[in-house]
């Protein structure tokens, strides 16, 4: 019985400075995952076009994100690292999925509603069809797992829906070509060409919030630079931002339950726990009953110790664009070989002549 080979896929848009939330919520975890899993990590520069970036800035951001990957510990000898636009099979499979997915499915995507806002009629078709390309990114490599944040869970569910509909729509053709793979859907054993990709469950650091508003996710689009710690920030800037982080007037609680309803306190304790690879309970054992100034001082030292080596290596790599380009080129060749193998089967399945 054939089964899908375990494979992890994930990607990041090159749209500005990566920050602490990206590192703790994604990249740090990816570094750990590559030790035990086969991984593909992608800089999704095709997705970036949905926000109409300056072309020169997009190329620079693509290199900076790649530099952050490498500086944080992602090893191109262990994992495939590439930028999406080098492998045009992403767009080819996305078109197939555009013909499989239903408009109603896309219309329910909350991220489109959030990004398009009230001016939906002027939003680009690319933004509307973003989840279809995301599904293609994942399924082009027949990835079995994806580390996802809260804001991407709905898109992964759509990816599974698209995979299942493709498998159902073309079930006879898949069987006749002998390219089906056995998998379990609920209690039923079925055969399909694409896997129903599973989310990788993250630890508590998955959602890092703004330093200025604990109810909002840390974001590179926030107009206040004090709201986030960028991976390119120097030691003094990191310390300043943590010192100025918003808190409430009460001291730190001794129990995790005491963080309820206190988003800024919860965020700082969570960041400390994530950077120190411990738990909120352990942090509060040390700082419970003390003032925020004590936690902030220790957190600043910890953040500098953890992030400064990444910052220095990232700057060194950005100064050597030829090396970054070679990493992306080599990764693109590896990814392209896998992608073409998948698409040869997809073309046969849907009936595109290839002779």
UniProtKB/Swiss-Prot annotation:
Motif 'HIGH' region, residue range(s) on this chain: 14-22
PROSITE patterns the record matches: AA_TRNA_LIGASE_I
UniProt keyword terms in alphabetical order: Aminoacyl-tRNA synthetase, ATP-binding, Cytoplasm, Ligase, Nucleotide-binding, Protein biosynthesis
Primary localization: cytoplasm
GO cellular component, one term: cytosol
Top-level class of the enzyme under EC nomenclature: ligase
EC assignment: 6.1.1.2
Sites where the protein binds L-tryptophan: 137
Gene Ontology molecular function, alphabetical: ATP binding; tryptophan-tRNA ligase activity
Coiled coil ranges: none
Sequence positions that bind ATP: 13-15, 21-22, 149-151, 208, 217-221
Biological processes per GO annotation: tryptophanyl-tRNA aminoacylation
Keyword ATP-binding applies: yes
'KMSKS' region, short sequence motif: residues: 217-221
Location(s) in or outside the cell: Cytoplasm
Annotated catalysed reactions: tRNA(Trp) + L-tryptophan + ATP = L-tryptophyl-tRNA(Trp) + AMP + diphosphate + H(+)
Family statement: Belongs to the class-I aminoacyl-tRNA synthetase family.
Function comment: Catalyzes the attachment of tryptophan to tRNA(Trp).
Record text on subunit structure and interactions: Homodimer.
PANTHER family (UniProt xref): TRYPTOPHAN--TRNA LIGASE, MITOCHONDRIAL
Name of the protein in its database record: Tryptophan--tRNA ligase
Organism placement in taxonomy: Bacteria, Pseudomonadati, Pseudomonadota, Alphaproteobacteria, Hyphomicrobiales
